[in-house]
């Protein structure tokens, strides 16, 4: 098994070096694929991993420390490091799986008809922020009220 994995790793290293130098119909490889997201080649791994939904600064630092990978550019990864990185990121909840989980939790709040669920249903903030003058992100763009007249100028 080890011999097969080692040969797969060397084959992967060769393909990666070819992909760095080869263009296909004028297109170049811009990054590596980790956790169903594209990690750019020209960014350090610590910031590049943050492109994956559900991985922020803290978790990317934890992943790299656990693997013992320094904060180098994504294009400088060896095949073994890339395989280990994909396996490590795969152990955490990320991407579409995390989006589905968050959506189902919000749907559960709406179905239970608790306060937070009703705020989600009406598109209002649910953590106590004021809504009289702010909350534009949640409520959307401000709409003018028809029939409201401006005060006359003196």
Curated annotation (Swiss-Prot):
Biased composition (Basic residues): 136-154
GO cellular component: mitochondrial small ribosomal subunit; mitochondrion
Keywords, ordered alphabetically: Mitochondrion, Ribonucleoprotein, Ribosomal protein, RNA-binding, rRNA-binding, Transit peptide
Coiled coil ranges: none
Domain of life (superkingdom): Eukaryota
Transit peptide (first-last residue): 1-30
Pfam families noted in UniProt: Ribosomal_S13
Region of interest (Disordered), residue spans: 121-154
GO biological process, one term: translation
InterPro entries: Rbsml_uS13_C, Ribosomal_uS13, Ribosomal_uS13-like_H2TH, Ribosomal_uS13_CS
Keyword Ribonucleoprotein among record annotations: yes
Signal peptide: none
Gene3D superfamilies: 1.10.8.50, 30s ribosomal protein s13, domain 2 (4.10.910.10)
GO molecular function: rRNA binding; structural constituent of ribosome
Compartments, record wording: Mitochondrion
Main function: Located at the top of the head of the small subunit, it contacts several helices of the 18S rRNA.
Assembly description: Part of the small ribosomal subunit.
Family of the protein in this entry: Belongs to the universal ribosomal protein uS13 family.
HAMAP family xrefs: Ribosomal_uS13
Protein name: Small ribosomal subunit protein uS13m
Native organism: Arabidopsis thaliana (Mouse-ear cress)
Gene: RPS13
């Amino acid at each position: 098994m080890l011999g097969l994995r080692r040969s797969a790793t060397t084959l992967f290293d060769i393909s990666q070096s070819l992909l760095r130098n080869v263009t296909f119909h004028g297109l170049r490889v811009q990054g590596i694929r980790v956790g169903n997201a594209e990690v750019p080649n020209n960014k350090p791994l610590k910031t590049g991993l943050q492109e994956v939904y559900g991985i922020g600064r803290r978790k990317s630092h934890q992943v790299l420390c656990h693997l013992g990978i320094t904060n180098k550019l994504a294009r400088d990864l060896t095949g073994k490091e890339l395989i280990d990185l994909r396996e490590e990121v795969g152990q955490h909840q990320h991407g579409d799986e995390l989006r589905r989980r968050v959506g189902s939790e919000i749907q559960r709040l709406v179905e239970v008809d608790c306060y937070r669920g009703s705020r989600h249903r009406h598109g209002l903030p649910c953590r106590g922020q004021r809504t009289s003058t702010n909350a534009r992100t949640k409520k959307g763009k401000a709409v003018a009220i028809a029939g409201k007249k401006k005060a006359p100028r003196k």
